[in-house]
UniProtKB/Swiss-Prot annotation:
Gene Ontology molecular function: structural constituent of ribosome
Family the entry assigns: Belongs to the bacterial ribosomal protein bL27 family.
Organism phylogeny: Bacteria, Bacillati, Cyanobacteriota, Cyanophyceae, Synechococcales
Keywords: Ribonucleoprotein, Ribosomal protein
Source organism of this protein record: Prochlorococcus marinus (strain AS9601)
NCBIfam families referenced in this protein's UniProt entry, alphabetically: L27 (TIGR00062)
Record protein name field: Large ribosomal subunit protein bL27
Source species, domain of life: Bacteria
GO biological process: translation
Gene: rpmA
InterPro entries: Ribosomal_bL27, Ribosomal_bL27_CS
PANTHER family according to UniProt: LARGE RIBOSOMAL SUBUNIT PROTEIN BL27M, RIBOSOMAL PROTEIN L27
Entry GO terms, CC: cytosolic large ribosomal subunit
Region of interest (Disordered), residue spans: 1-24
Pfam family, one: Ribosomal_L27
Keyword Chloroplast: no
Length: 86
């Protein structure tokens, strides 16, 4: 009874490509309209003033201005809201 599988058969060797998620524009940065602010899965960050949300939950600037973050309490979860200050 073999206890090794033999040459050329392994169950390892798979990995997915990174999705490059995260904050792309930090607080205090100046951005133009259409700039991507955050790439995310789900809504860890919520859109605030002058910020739109895409179908994949990406947050983007609707107007030119400066990025600002604020903490909010929503349904016992601490979330952050992203605003663009003009």
């Amino acid at each position: 009874m073999a206890h090794k599988k033999g040459t050329g058969s392994t169950r390892n060797g798979r990995d997915s490509n990174s999705k490059r998620l995260g904050v792309k524009a930090y607080g205090g940065e100046k951005v133009t309209a259409g700039s991507i602010l955050i790439r995310q899965r789900g809504t860890s960050f919520l859109p605030g003033n002058n910020v739109g949300i895409g179908k994949d939950d990406t947050l983007f600037a609707l107007k030119e201005g400066t990025v600002s973050f604020e903490s909010i309490k929503r349904n016992l979860k601490n979330r952050k809201r992203v605003n663009i200050v003009i």
